[in-house]
Regions:
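N-terminal secretory signal peptides that target proteins for export/translocation
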Residues: 1-3
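Extracellular adhesion/carbohydrate-binding repeat motifs centered on closely spaced tryptophans
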Residues: 5-216
Length: 216
């Protein structure tokens, strides 16, 4: 019996020696992350283009760092960024474009915008108010709400409430609006200007909307 146990022990030892050793110190596998393609923004004759590896970016969205901030751009089939006409729309007006079934607004520098803006679908069409959500998508419900409150001859209280705190206000002399018995007042916000008629006398608080437009 002792001899059998001894033989068994020897066989077990041989198996242990022959078995491969697996430890935490296995040979490391090098994993190299794919290099991120660098996008370069260039301005040519007033138009913005994006290049990657020397080729124009076309029919695509890109987020590009300009200065210390990052902005969203969309480049059309010719590689041109959608952008508003500064001469017609000013610095805050936007060009409204449809991309894959959704509408977005772009300023004169090609930046996609958010929030309330004055804009139009072309440089020569009549501007109107547009509201874009946190993702830059046109919000029809909020847009209608702002447009209804901003109708000419309506009480200015509602649109002023929606617009919130203004940056500055200016009051002119006699107005030509309505019966002319009052003053023209312009409230300036970040991207919007609200023009109202302020009656004289006891009705001075009952301002009337003249117009709402993008801030030039």
């Amino acid at each position: 019996m002792k001899k059998i146990k001894k033989v068994f022990a020897v066989l077990l030892l041989m198996l242990l020696v022959a078995a491969p050793v697996v430890t935490a110190a296995t040979q490391p596998v090098a994993v190299e992350a794919a290099a991120k393609t660098k996008t370069k923004l260039k301005k040519v004759k007033g138009k913005y283009y994006a290049y990657e590896k020397g080729k124009k970016v076309c029919n695509k969205w890109r987020t590009i760092k300009v200065g210390k901030k990052k902005y969203r751009f969309y480049f059309d089939k010719k590689g041109r960024a959608y952008q508003a006409n500064k001469a017609a729309m000013g610095k805050t007006g936007v060009l409204v474009k449809k991309i894959k079934g959704k509408y977005y607004g772009f300023d004169y520098q090609g930046h996609m915008v958010k929030g309330l803006r004055g804009g139009s679908t072309s440089a020569y069409s009549m501007p109107n108010l547009y509201f874009f959500n946190s993702k830059g998508v046109y919000d029809k419900k909020k847009t209608v709400m702002y447009r209804n409150a901003a109708k000419t001859n309506s009480n200015a209280a509602q649109i002023k409430k929606l617009l919130g705190k203004y940056k500055k206000v200016s009051v002119t002399g006699e107005s030509c609006f309505g019966d002319g018995n009052g003053s023209d007042v312009v409230y300036v916000y970040d991207n919007i200007e609200l023009s109202v008629f302020r009656p004289t006398g006891k009705d001075a608080s009952a301002e009337i909307v003249e117009s709402v437009s993008q801030r030039y």
